[in-house]
Amino acid sequence: MNAYVASVIDYVKTTHANQPEFVQTVEEVLSSVSPIMDAHPEYEKVDLLKRMVEPERMFTFRVCWMDDKGEYHTNRGWRCQFNGAIGPYKGGLRFQKNVYEGIIKFLGFEQTFKNSLTGLPMGGAKGGSDFDPAGKSDAEVMRFCQSFMTALYRYIGPDIDVPAGDMGVGGREIGYLYGQYRRLKGVWENGVLTGKGMSYGGSLIRPEATGYGAVYYLQEVLKHENDTIEGKRLAISGYGNVGWGIMKKAAELGAKVTYFAGPDGYIHDPDGVVGEKLDFILEMRAKDPMHCKPYADKYGVEFVPGEKCWGVKDVDVYMPAATQNDVRMESAEKIAASGVKYYIEVANMPTTNDALNYLRAQKHMIVAPSKAVNAGGVGVSGLEMSQNSERLVWTAEEVDAQLHKMMKNIHKVSAEAAEEYGLGYDLVAGANIAGFKKVAQAMYEQGVF
């Protein structure tokens, strides 16, 4: 490893020791970029890596709100504007009780390179709160969102920082956030947020975009291996917007999700989640997002409580699509032993570093990284920004075609970057290198500040 790269990784481990998720993603990305640093000693002269691992700015604020009983609560909010070298800051908002500064920074750092891979002019950012919308009334969520935006609005804008949804932040929350932004600013700037409803400037297929893009990326991997998606059986974790998008697009292209996992266990449906079953997934999730067992009850298929589907052998592709560090070493060993060839990360950093390195070392496996695979979500957010700027609404077919083109290009540039540096078909390193190169050169050309 390049000595400068190693020193920056050590620096992050020392100065951010209480933020393990952030340390993990920095180590995962920087461990791939030694060839670039060897080829560009000028980057070390301006201390580019140490600047890159520190956010440009980080806002922390209190969010006070009143529940339906008239009792007051205070949560913490964050917005991390990590890197704006290639465009306005762009990244989602996560409302989840386990959110803290380290998770926001990890997501913002990862977002920087993901956005770079899309080819669109978007910098990296992330934000959120330790507020949990689950179990809250619509009125309580509205009051929280209004308070959150009151603290945030002065730091964002269509050409400054454009938040979007993430875990715990869907169309309802985006609507409340935009309503408060408009109330405070007194202007119509619907490009300030993405993931909006169609009635006020949203984009078609945005909720499904991450899942659709993941399947398009898988399709490119299969093409590279002279294989086809037709008939492929997929095992996924999660059945939210991302998981549902995977199910729907896989079915359209002739594949099927035969295993999917939720918080309470996993489902095995040999016939796949297709047809009207896709509609039932939406109904089930809306009623109770914590339990997938009702699917087994309705369709008479197998439900395994309290377990994940990692290690099942009668599938062709694994796609972790739930949350970070879902797949640890024990699960990775089961996955490798199953003989399955394709491991396609979809959630942000769903695999621990030791598990990821273990899977990458398996000669029979191809591993694709989340920052490339799930970039379709933010890619379509970027397309929503374009539509807002043009005062136009594109058809679903137009958006889907642009998404498909984008995912093909992300796979192409990742594979080419790996090949350029003698790494074969290493998509993990290739995505890190391809995303890093653009950001690094932009930072270098803009000087030290």
What are these regions (language model features)?
Residues G265-V367, A372:
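Rossmann-like adenosine-cofactor binding region
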Residues G202-V312:
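Glycine-rich phosphate/diphosphate-binding loop of Rossmann-like nucleotide-binding domains
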Residues E42-E71:
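Structured beta-strand/loop patches that form or line metal/cofactor-binding pockets in enzymes
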Residues N2-T25, V221-L222, A336-F449:
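Adenosine-phosphate binding glycine-rich loop
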Residues F61-M122, K126, D130:
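Phosphate-interaction motifs
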Residues P20-V23, A39-V46, G119, I156-G165, ...:
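Flexible, glycine/charged-enriched surface loops at secondary-structure junctions
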Residues Q96, N115-E230:
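Glycine/serine-rich phosphate-binding loop and adjoining beta1-alpha1 elements at the start
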